[in-house]
Amino acid sequence: MEKLLDEIYDSVPQGGAQSDGAESANFNLYSFDDTGNAQRFFNLFGGEMIYNHIDKMWLYWDGKRWHADLDKETYRRAAISVEEMRKELEFYQNQDDSDGTENAKNFSKHIKYTRSMKGEKALIEMAQQLLPVLPSQLDRHIMAFNTASGIISLKTGELTPHNPKWFITKISEVEYSAGNNYSCPRWLKFLDEIFNGDKDLIHYVQKAVGYSLTGKTSEQCAFFLFGTGNNGKSTFLDVVRDIAGEYAMNIQPETIMIRTATAAANSDIARLKGARLVTSVEPNEGVRINEGLLKQLTGEDTVTARKLYGNEFEFKPEFKLWMATNHKPIIRGTDTGIWRRIHMIPFTVSIPEEKKDKQLKDKLEREYPDILRWAVEGCLLWQREGLEMPRAVREMCKEYRREMDVISAFIDDRCEVAEKSFAKASQLYAAYVTWCDENNEHKFSNTKFGVEMAKRFEKKRTMDGWFYVGIKLLQ
């Protein structure tokens, strides 16, 4: 991997500040125009500035990561480049011949032009051509996690110094020190409280959080945190999001629900490129998950997205979705393809108001460095053990799937399953439609209903039409 990173870094043009002794030898290489200005800028900042032509954005190395220039750092450095041109002017002024005098006169005029808005803008635009970088060259190492202390290898837990060659653009501001030991007693007590002492569940959650620090999506799952209020799930999610830092993003729950504004949804998805942990909180009751989109986002396939007013682009999702909810989002699909992706984590403990720790958030923040070590240890455990659901999660998922199975609910309520019974398909569907209307349930089409019933019962054709064998309508 290090060799690959060296090759990528070497492919990006590098400049660098000149030494005092080399200045006079290089001054004659610069032209008195925009191209020369760009070359001056390049030689000063070529190792610290890059330009992403696809996203049309400058990035600068701040000592820890490549930072998107949202605060006009490029213009500040352009101003420094112009100030450095005074040394070049002095070089020409110190020449005794007529060429030196003429050059000094012309260069003085050129400096005045370069200081103008037009000249400064031209300098920056020309420099873009000298310092190109592709989006594919950024954040390539999905098992590296950048922190205030250095880069964590999520394969080993070891820490290495910050390095521009890694082309990392994100960071968690949490400090980290390598080692197997961590001390976060209030965090561990909090987990014990909200998960009711279920050690298997806590062990699973530690691995899930650690897995979510990586850019891998091999588990192909989303985490739903379910429970009524006052159970700690929001606090839990806040802590996980905080230690993930810039690797975490939040989305409105509507992004992954069925809705008509597909353009807005696609723009929301475009924001998630490069994120590793995506959180969402409290979808409205009765909303339905966009199952096709959820499958796509939790898989390992390429996604097509488009920023608002921008062009389409493709990327592979690296994020894991964590959604906290008091209401179970509606899932109409009955296939394993959707249900195997849902990991519903139960939050069954309700914490009374009088027992709430008002200082809990502050106490947990003081433990962030060790909570990060706890999460990295979870990542190492995940790589050794996998992410098999514990009993509490399996049972919650099973209950969730049963609740979402409208046809099974209809059969339980209006039918009798018996080996030698039979029911006419048209009558069964009519009864199903009536039952859905009475219970305010979503109705499948006749075709979809037939497909689902055929999974459960044998279907035969007679002179009187189609019948299902092994079921009858209750009178």
Protein language model annotation of sequence segments:
Residues 57-60, 65-78:
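Trp- and S/T/G-rich repeat-edge/linker motifs of beta-rich repeat architectures
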Residues 72-90:
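Acidic, aromatic-enriched beta-alpha/helix-loop junctions
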Residues 1-14:
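N-terminal acidic, proline/glycine-rich, low-complexity intrinsically disordered segments
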